[in-house]
Amino acid sequence: MYKRQKLVAGGTGKPDGLDKGYFVKPTVFADVNNNMEVARTEIFGPVLSVIPFETEEDAIKIANDTTYGLTNYIQTQDSEKVQRVARKLRSGMVDVNGAGIAVDAPFGGFKHSGIGREAGEHGLEEFLEVKAVGGWSN
């Protein structure tokens, strides 16, 4: 277990009723700051670290202060804020209000969260070879 943050929900062990297989409890930590290991590690599991912030710019700075960049999440009903904040986030995907990413949208991250894209038009480019032809003909 990580030190200093407060366990709000979940924790170690499997969820009730799931004795077989590889499952972990959905887990929420509070009192997290961006210097803690739980905030600096790319965790592939149902783990949420709640990091307080004062301003929108502060939240963007915290979100971008990582070597990873798979997905960011924005919760707001303000569509202008969504556009403004999403442009500043250094991640391959931005999920708004828990709607999820469309199945035909490109999937992939920035920085150490992956190179390239899967799905969508950008995902197809991985299987194509581009050729440049220069010069002129009579």
Regions found by a protein language model. Give the residues of each.
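Conserved small/polar residues in nucleotide/adenosyl-binding loops
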Residues: M1-Q5
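Residue-level detector of anion-binding/catalytic polar loops
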Residues: K6-L7, G69
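Short beta-strand segments
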Residues: L7-G11, I74-Q75
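Short, solvent-exposed loop/turn elements at beta->coil junctions and helix N-caps
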Residues: G11-G17
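Conserved C-terminal structural/oligomerization subdomain of aldehyde/semialdehyde dehydrogenase
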Residues: F23-N138
